[in-house]
């Protein structure tokens, strides 16, 4: 009996030691970026300045090539932690092929692009995408940088962890920017959750125009898993102050990305499906009067990943779109239906004119 008791106590003690050690390791290695820092820059040796007033954009959360049509995800009620290698390769090949076909677009704002992560098998997705877009500068800002994520504890701890992650936002641009900076969003989860979670941010690139004005392009990815929208409210307040200050200086502002919330006055359940348990928030209608929310209300941009994609039942909505300052004229905006083949998000293309 004493032997059994010692064995049980030993197992409990070992588990406690590993758990505490994991928290210490996570805390010591926690990614803690400053409020503002230069983005990782990969400029071209020779590239034109911005001269045309009519510009094209594309936004897309590529889901680290891990959330294609056949995948689900444990944090959304599914079972999978990461895809099989062949599935990841196929998802990424599809995303890369599509983006290569759109290389004439001036600006491509991408989210959930991995640089080195277990979930994407160590592939530097940003560098491979850059090779397919040889006429574009590219800039990277990390928003998910963790040495080791132990979850999920299912069926047992450390059996199938997320592991290491380094991923974030990438902006590709044909015109030459004068600067590219990462701006840290305020707010975070409490300890210890925050040491294993994303550090949300936006990636800003600036382009000189005539008359000392600038075009300010913002690539943003706002919080998910945010009960009550507390984190998103803080992020949106910061973004509002920031873009208003830029507009009041006479600059042109275009912000796009994955907002993890629907645009004002858009019915989140426009594409009604059997899965209706999701409570999707809208950005308040009075957020920025006089500014333009550019989205395609006829094409869903996001699907829920509790199960693999079923066009007949999977809940879909619009959470990927653009915000334009009053001096930017919307010419067209179009969601691109790829049937969620490569990601749980779909691209959205935009054309604008600077007034």
Residue ranges and their predicted role:
Residues 64-72, 181, 303-304, 332:
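Short, solvent-exposed loop/turn elements at domain surfaces
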Residues 2-11, 21-45, 206, 237, ...:
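Metal-dependent phosphoester-hydrolase catalytic domains
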């Amino acid at each position: 009996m004493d032997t059994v008791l010692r064995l049980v106590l030993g197992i409990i003690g070992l588990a406690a030691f590993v758990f505490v050690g994991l928290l210490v390791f996570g805390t010591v290695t926690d990614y803690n970026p400053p409020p503002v820092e230069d983005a990782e820059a990969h400029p071209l040796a020779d590239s034109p300045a911005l001269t045309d007033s009519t510009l094209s954009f594309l936004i897309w959360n590529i889901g680290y090539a891990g959330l294609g049509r056949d995948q689900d995800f444990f944090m959304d009620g599914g079972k999978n932690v990461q895809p099989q290698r062949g599935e990841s390769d196929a998802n990424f090949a599809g995303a890369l092929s599509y983006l290569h076909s759109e290389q004439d677009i001036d600006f491509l704002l991408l989210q959930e692009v991995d640089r080195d992560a277990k979930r994407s098998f160590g592939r530097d997705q940003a560098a491979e995408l850059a090779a397919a877009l040889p006429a574009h500068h590219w800039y990277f800002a990390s928003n998910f940088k963790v040495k080791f994520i132990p979850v999920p504890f299912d069926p047992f701890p450390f059996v199938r962890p997320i592991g290491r992650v380094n991923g974030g936002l990438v902006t590709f641009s044909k015109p030459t920017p004068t600067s590219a900076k990462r701006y840290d969003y305020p707010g975070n989860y409490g300890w210890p959750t925050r040491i294993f979670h994303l550090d949300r941010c936006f990636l800003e690139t600036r382009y000189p125009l005539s008359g000392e004005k600038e075009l300010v392009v913002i690539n943003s990815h706002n919080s998910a898993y945010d009960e009550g929208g507390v984190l998103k409210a803080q992020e949106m307040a910061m973004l509002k102050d920031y873009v208003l200050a830029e507009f009041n200086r006479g600059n042109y502002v275009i912000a796009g990305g994955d907002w993890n919330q629907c645009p004002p006055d858009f019915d989140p359940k426009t594409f009604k499906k059997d899965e209706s348990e999701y409570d999707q928030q809208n950005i308040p209608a009075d957020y920025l009067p006089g500014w333009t929310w550019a989205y395609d209300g006829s094409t869903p941009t996001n699907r829920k990943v509790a199960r693999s994609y079923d066009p007949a039942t999977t809940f879909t909505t619009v959470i990927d779109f653009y915000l334009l300052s009053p001096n930017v004229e919307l010419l067209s905006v179009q969601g691109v239906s790829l049937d969620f083949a490569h990601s749980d998000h779909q691209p959205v293309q935009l054309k604008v004119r600077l007034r």
